[in-house]
Amino acid sequence: MSFLRCLAILGLVVFAFNFELAKPLKASEFEDTASLNMYGMPGEIEIPSAKNLPDGQFSVSSTAFGGTIRVNLSFQIFENLTGAFRYARIPSASGDHNGYYWDRSFDFHYLAFKEKPFFPSVALGARDFIGTGLYSGEYIVATKSIGSRTKISGGLGWGRLAGKNSFDNILGFGNRKGRNFS
């Protein structure tokens, strides 16, 4: 059975299971709920945010972009700690495994400070903390809500979340070499 067929079946099973158990959120609960980024963690697109999922939430998500497919299993472990397991299929020019590289990784996201009226929420996290190191990166991010519909995030990242010629990681993580797929 192909990877995409397994992914489609998993999605249908999860949808059917959640359809019966899902309960609508009240408007006040929805305003402070985090969205999931392409890595299955709280954030927008590929950038983390200093928000958390509701306590006890389990999420399954998948993304496809530029030939890469990621399947994410996210869970709110404790009130301030989010974790995610990821399995990814990445196009590889080396020809390994029918032209694809298969990667797995584990992330965590810790909300250190909750948002106050005049102070942002602050979170620390590590992407691909346990795994091959392909997506490895660490970050500290602050998020502040402006009104009920707008959130602004800013932060500092290392590893995959940093630019070229940036300074060394102060935590000492991320010394693993990335892979070149070209």
What annotation goes with each model-predicted range?
Residues 25-137, 143-150, 154, 158-163, ...:
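Transmembrane beta-barrel domains of Gram-negative outer membranes and organellar outer membranes
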Residues 1-37:
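Cleavable N-terminal export/targeting peptides
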